Amino acid sequence: MRILPELLKPYPYLQSRQSGHLQVSELHCIYYEVSGNPNGKPALVVHGGPGGGSQPEYRRYFDPTIYMIVQFDQRGCGQSTPHASLEDNTMWHLVADMEQLREFL
């Protein structure tokens, strides 16, 4: 059963090639980072919570030659603003933010 550890072995650290903030509502601005293959299959990384944020380690679980790795900080989390805000911060808002980010990129 030595194959399982090989499958879980992360890829080397990878710098983001694009990052910024996207205004998704009058109140909220989400932070995002893009790395990997610019023409690759999109892989959207959704971090845990509550209050967490994207971490560089998360992108290590995707092959950067195959995937365009997109990470973002959900409303109220990480480098998104306003920090720790619960206003207009529901699952429906999260889905809408992901769609807005997809269209932007």
Regions found by a protein language model. Give the residues of each.
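Short, flexible loop segments at the rims of nucleotide/cofactor-binding pockets, characterized by
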Residues: 21, 47-49, 87-91
